[in-house]
Amino acid sequence: MHLRMASPPQPGPYMPDLPAVPAWLNKGDTAWQLVAATFVGIQSMPGLVVIYGSIVKKKWAVNSAFMALYAYASTLIVWVLVGFRMAFGDRLLPFWAKAGPALTQDFLVQRAVFPATAHYGSDGTLETPRTEPFYAEAALVLFEFEFAAITLVLLAGSLLGRMNIKAWMAFTPLWLLFSYTVGAFSLWGGGFLYQWGVIDYSGGYVIHLSSGVAGFTAAYWVGPRLKSDRERFSPNNILLMIAGGGLLWLGWAGFNGGAPYAPNVTATVAVLNTNVSAATSLLTWTCLDVIFFGKPSVIGAVQGMMTGLVCITPGAGLVHTWSAMLMGMFAGSVPWFTMMILHKKSTFLMKVDDTLAVFHTHAVAGILGGVLTGLLATPELCALDCPIPNMRGVFYGSGIGQLGKQLGGALFVTVWNLIVTSAILLCIGLFIPLRMSDDQLMIGDDAAHGEEAYALWGDGEKFDVTRPETTRTGGAGGAGREDTMEQRLTNMGARGVTIQL
């Protein structure tokens, strides 16, 4: 009788000894972080690309969408070359980490870690260990890239309709390296604001305040659009703009839900609070439009949605849901006031041509959210996510100290972005014009790219403003009449509601 030796058991899909599944890796955490990264990516691609291509005048649809597309792609390359480790690597300075690539498998397949995030008490004892999520470094690199990319895409909203695309191509990598990485390390990567106790749960300061301030600063240096464009900048497709806004709203589930670096209770609270704040802010903004202007504005509703999402971001996982509703009410009213009332009364604000009012929807809403988080953050939720023991808002016993920290963090981010953005643009301006020429601005996409979003004219013919046969007005009473260049270009714009700033 021959006995057959049993073959050794084959590793199953959930066994811990698979080469690709080390003991520290949690498959659920990995799956959620990749999904969250994808959600945030969808906010930029196609969310903001669609919004930018539809909310602007028809002649700027291609250029506006491409500015977002280019920013997204260029950010990824710079991020893996040096940017990620400048924002989340080993400490170099109190506000900056050491540069280095995130390209080798030796680095990317190891357990993710934030090396500078350990927090020590005043006596030198370790109070909070460094953050080490249960997935590979590659997942963290991807997730944090999406945050960096959307910051630059948001910044572009201040510059639509006149910035030289070559200057924009030079600006994006420089701003990422010298501005974004500083804010990210200071507040998230273990820098001095992180260690001091400034709360920025998911980017109210790192992303929204920085993009709003930098966008406004860049708009000042680049200069305004043509007078005719500033006076009439009608969206070319409001329905498409709403679709892009919907992608932005739903994608925020990954934005705030992925911030704890795990699918835990903090993430669930954050996602619920995010939606509540967005809805409340949208309704508040719409009601104010009806009260003061007699009718609801669809563009205003999208702006209100945006400010609600931005305002809740600094504290999404740290406040009660009733607090999220309160924050939504402030988000729908304070930026509305600064945009619709204060802006029009300020000579300086009127001088700076912030195309999509990014300063109001992101900088103002971001600071507002940071301040309200300093008031409303609960000790129970802070204990689950914050690095310093006993963190809480003013209304829960922190005293005025936490509010002071929130204001101090906002001041640092504002001043840094003001100085660095100005320096970058002044340097670029020595070699590349920041603004397109007036002749190019009259034409738009065709001058900038040789392409048009809506290129068919008449019976399948591409419209060409330089060819008389395609610009003559026919029909009864109009045969043989030629419009002036200004009239033809004006007629190309869509009719509809516009953002009047």
UniProtKB/Swiss-Prot annotation:
Signal peptide per UniProt: none
Membrane topology term: Multi-pass membrane protein
Subcellular location(s) of the protein: Membrane
GO molecular function, one term: ammonium channel activity
A GO-annotated cellular component: plasma membrane
GO biological process: ammonium transmembrane transport
Domain of life: Eukaryota
Major place of residence: membrane
Pfam families from the UniProt entry: Ammonium_transp
Protein name, per record: Ammonium transporter 2 member 2
Gene that this sequence comes from: AMT2-2
NCBIfam families cross-referenced by the UniProt entry: amt
Keywords: Ammonia transport, Membrane, Transmembrane, Transmembrane helix, Transport
Organism the protein comes from: Oryza sativa subsp. japonica
Family: Belongs to the ammonia transporter channel (TC 1.A.11.2) family.
Record field: transmembrane: 35-55, 64-84, 140-160, 174-194, 203-223, 238-258, 274-294, 298-318, 322-342, 356-376, 412-432
UniProt function note: Involved in ammonium transport.
